[in-house]
Protein backbone atom coordinates (compact mmCIF):
# COMPACT_ATOMS: atom_id res chain seq x y z
CA UNK A 1 0.00 0.00 0.00
CA UNK A 2 1.35 3.41 -0.91
CA UNK A 3 1.80 6.43 1.30
CA UNK A 4 0.87 8.91 -1.46
CA UNK A 5 -0.95 8.30 -4.73
CA UNK A 6 -0.50 10.36 -7.91
CA UNK A 7 -3.28 12.83 -7.06
CA UNK A 8 -1.67 13.58 -3.68
CA UNK A 9 1.75 13.93 -5.30
CA UNK A 10 0.36 16.55 -7.69
CA UNK A 11 -0.86 18.58 -4.71
CA UNK A 12 2.75 18.86 -3.53
CA UNK A 13 4.77 19.45 -6.69
CA UNK A 14 3.94 21.40 -9.86
CA UNK A 15 4.98 18.67 -12.32
CA UNK A 16 2.30 17.17 -14.57
CA UNK A 17 2.19 14.76 -17.49
CA UNK A 18 4.34 14.36 -19.51
CA UNK A 19 6.99 15.49 -17.00
CA UNK A 20 5.66 13.80 -13.84
CA UNK A 21 7.94 10.81 -13.27
CA UNK A 22 6.47 9.05 -10.27
CA UNK A 23 3.44 6.86 -9.80
CA UNK A 24 3.34 6.54 -6.04
CA UNK A 25 5.26 7.12 -2.84
CA UNK A 26 5.86 3.79 -1.12
CA UNK A 27 7.72 4.95 1.99
CA UNK A 28 8.16 8.37 3.54
CA UNK A 29 10.12 9.31 6.64
CA UNK A 30 9.84 13.13 6.65
CA UNK A 31 13.21 14.83 6.79
CA UNK A 32 15.00 11.50 6.41
CA UNK A 33 14.12 9.34 3.40
CA UNK A 34 11.61 8.45 0.70
CA UNK A 35 11.04 5.53 -1.67
CA UNK A 36 9.04 6.19 -4.84
CA UNK A 37 7.88 3.94 -7.68
CA UNK A 38 7.96 4.90 -11.36
CA UNK A 39 6.54 2.30 -13.74
CA UNK A 40 8.30 2.80 -17.05
CA UNK A 41 5.96 2.03 -19.96
CA UNK A 42 6.37 2.01 -23.74
CA UNK A 43 3.74 4.79 -23.81
CA UNK A 44 6.21 7.34 -22.39
CA UNK A 45 6.49 10.17 -24.92
CA UNK A 46 10.30 10.24 -24.81
CA UNK A 47 10.54 6.71 -26.23
CA UNK A 48 9.35 8.02 -29.61
CA UNK A 49 12.75 9.57 -30.20
CA UNK A 50 15.05 7.91 -27.65
CA UNK A 51 15.68 5.64 -29.49
CA UNK A 52 13.36 4.30 -32.22
CA UNK A 53 13.67 0.52 -32.23
CA UNK A 54 15.82 0.60 -29.09
CA UNK A 55 13.84 2.43 -26.38
CA UNK A 56 16.02 3.74 -23.54
CA UNK A 57 14.90 6.12 -20.77
CA UNK A 58 17.14 9.20 -21.00
CA UNK A 59 19.50 9.56 -18.05
CA UNK A 60 18.48 13.18 -17.57
CA UNK A 61 14.90 12.01 -16.99
CA UNK A 62 16.06 9.50 -14.38
CA UNK A 63 17.75 12.44 -12.63
CA UNK A 64 14.49 14.41 -12.96
CA UNK A 65 12.55 11.53 -11.40
CA UNK A 66 15.00 11.48 -8.48
CA UNK A 67 14.68 15.27 -8.12
CA UNK A 68 10.89 14.95 -8.01
CA UNK A 69 11.15 12.29 -5.31
CA UNK A 70 13.52 14.57 -3.38
CA UNK A 71 10.99 17.40 -3.73
CA UNK A 72 8.31 15.29 -2.07
CA UNK A 73 10.69 14.42 0.77
CA UNK A 74 11.53 18.09 1.28
CA UNK A 75 8.05 19.54 0.87
CA UNK A 76 6.41 17.09 3.28
CA UNK A 77 8.19 18.83 6.15
CA UNK A 78 6.13 21.47 7.95
CA UNK A 79 8.89 24.02 7.42
CA UNK A 80 8.51 23.90 3.63
CA UNK A 81 4.78 23.24 3.21
CA UNK A 82 3.38 25.19 0.27
CA UNK A 83 6.82 26.01 -1.14
CA UNK A 84 8.65 24.76 -4.23
CA UNK A 85 11.90 22.78 -4.20
CA UNK A 86 14.26 23.68 -7.04
CA UNK A 87 17.17 21.59 -8.25
CA UNK A 88 20.39 23.47 -7.54
CA UNK A 89 23.13 21.00 -8.46
CA UNK A 90 23.80 17.46 -9.62
CA UNK A 91 26.96 15.86 -8.28
CA UNK A 92 28.68 12.60 -9.20
CA UNK A 93 25.87 11.26 -11.40
CA UNK A 94 26.63 7.75 -12.60
CA UNK A 95 24.49 5.69 -14.96
CA UNK A 96 25.02 1.99 -14.46
CA UNK A 97 22.05 0.25 -16.09
CA UNK A 98 19.87 1.01 -19.09
CA UNK A 99 16.22 1.61 -18.16
CA UNK A 100 13.72 0.22 -20.67
CA UNK A 101 9.95 -0.07 -21.05
CA UNK A 102 8.57 -2.56 -18.56
CA UNK A 103 11.12 -1.70 -15.89
CA UNK A 104 9.99 -0.57 -12.46
CA UNK A 105 12.20 2.22 -11.16
CA UNK A 106 12.45 2.43 -7.39
CA UNK A 107 13.70 5.86 -6.44
CA UNK A 108 15.52 5.96 -3.09
CA UNK A 109 16.35 9.38 -1.67
CA UNK A 110 18.12 9.98 1.64
CA UNK A 111 18.55 13.41 3.25
CA UNK A 112 22.25 14.06 3.82
CA UNK A 113 22.21 17.61 5.17
CA UNK A 114 19.90 20.55 5.35
CA UNK A 115 20.53 24.16 6.29
CA UNK A 116 18.04 26.98 6.09
CA UNK A 117 16.44 26.65 2.65
CA UNK A 118 19.16 24.46 1.08
CA UNK A 119 20.16 20.86 1.38
CA UNK A 120 21.71 17.78 -0.16
CA UNK A 121 20.22 14.36 -0.80
CA UNK A 122 21.82 11.08 -1.83
CA UNK A 123 19.86 9.24 -4.52
CA UNK A 124 19.64 5.83 -6.14
CA UNK A 125 17.36 4.77 -8.97
CA UNK A 126 17.05 0.99 -8.82
CA UNK A 127 15.71 -1.58 -11.27
CA UNK A 128 15.32 -4.73 -9.24
CA UNK A 129 18.50 -5.08 -7.22
CA UNK A 130 20.66 -3.13 -9.70
CA UNK A 131 21.43 0.58 -9.48
CA UNK A 132 20.49 2.31 -12.73
CA UNK A 133 21.67 5.71 -11.49
CA UNK A 134 23.32 7.15 -8.40
CA UNK A 135 23.85 10.82 -7.65
CA UNK A 136 23.81 13.54 -5.03
CA UNK A 137 21.43 16.44 -5.59
CA UNK A 138 21.44 19.88 -4.03
CA UNK A 139 18.12 21.64 -3.65
CA UNK A 140 16.96 25.15 -2.88
CA UNK A 141 13.49 25.79 -1.47
CA UNK A 142 11.73 28.97 -2.49
CA UNK A 143 8.33 30.52 -2.65
CA UNK A 144 5.86 29.08 -5.10
CA UNK A 145 5.52 31.46 -8.04
CA UNK A 146 1.84 31.88 -8.82
CA UNK A 147 2.47 33.47 -12.24
Swiss-Prot record:
TM spans, by residue?
Answer: none
The record's subcellular locations are: Cytoplasm
Q: Name one GO cellular component term.
A: cytoplasm
Keyword annotations from UniProtKB, A to Z: Cytoplasm, Lipid A biosynthesis, Lipid biosynthesis, Lipid metabolism, Lyase
Q: Which reaction does it catalyse?
A: a (3R)-hydroxyacyl-[ACP] = a (2E)-enoyl-[ACP] + H2O
Q: Name one GO biological process term.
A: lipid A biosynthetic process
Active site: which residues?
50
Where primarily located?
Answer: cytoplasm
The UniProt GO MF terms for this protein read: (3R)-hydroxyacyl-[acyl-carrier-protein] dehydratase activity
EC identifiers of the protein: 4.2.1.59
- SUPFAM superfamilies, alphabetically? Thioesterase/thiol ester dehydrase-isomerase
Which is a Pfam family this sequence falls into?
FabA
Q: Which residues form a coiled coil?
A: none
Q: Which CDD domains match?
A: FabZ
List the Gene3D superfamilies. Hotdog Thioesterase
Task: State the function annotated in the UniProt record.
Answer: Involved in unsaturated fatty acids biosynthesis. Catalyzes the dehydration of short chain beta-hydroxyacyl-ACPs and long chain saturated and unsaturated beta-hydroxyacyl-ACPs.
Q: Which family does it belong to?
A: Belongs to the thioester dehydratase family. FabZ subfamily.
PANTHER family per UniProt: 3-HYDROXYACYL-[ACYL-CARRIER-PROTEIN] DEHYDRATASE
Report what the protein is called.
3-hydroxyacyl-[acyl-carrier-protein] dehydratase FabZ
In its UniProt entry, the species of origin is given as: Lactiplantibacillus plantarum (strain ATCC BAA-793 / NCIMB 8826 / WCFS1) (Lactobacillus plantarum)
Highest classification ranks of the organism: Bacteria, Bacillati, Bacillota, Bacilli, Lactobacillales
User: In the UniProt record, what gene is named as encoding this protein?
Assistant: fabZ
